[in-house]
Amino acid sequence: MSEKADTLACLTRETRMLTRIEQSLAHHFAHLEGPHTPPRLLAAMRHAVFPGGARIRPQLCLAVAGACGDNDPVLAEAAAVAIELLHCASLVHDDMPCFDDADARRGQPAVHKVFGEPLALLAGDGLIVMAFEVVARGGQMNPQRLGALIGAVGRG
């Protein structure tokens, strides 16, 4: 294969991976919608996650899973999404006035600037909870791997 073909194949793989990650994130957010989810909290959580950055962490997770045989793509995707949600939560908390007091993140106002500090704190916490819910749901078909995965995701 030529260098140009290799580059094109790599870009195609990366595009497919990013699409998979974005679709999975959107799916899990749609799962949250309903009468039991406060709309402003959900909006703040969405604001923290979309639009995303490079999504390097979930891409690395999926790439490692692929290199290891990816025998459970649902679980690998759940882990990738959870890692991104935890990363976004850390950014929300890091942007707060008590830490970096950032005005913007990813080209838009920081969550605390749009929704206020109390809701931003809850949004970051909500993303952490959501991350572990995603992993738990993704591991339903492979529960023997769930404990180790939850531990690995939790350790970062």
Outline where the language-model segments fall.
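Intrinsic-disorder/low-complexity, polar/charged segments
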Residues: 1-2, 143
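N-terminal amphipathic/basic leader segments beginning at the initiator methionine
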Residues: 2-33
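Mg2+-dependent prenyl diphosphate-binding active-site environment of isoprenoid biosynthetic enzymes
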Residues: 36-156
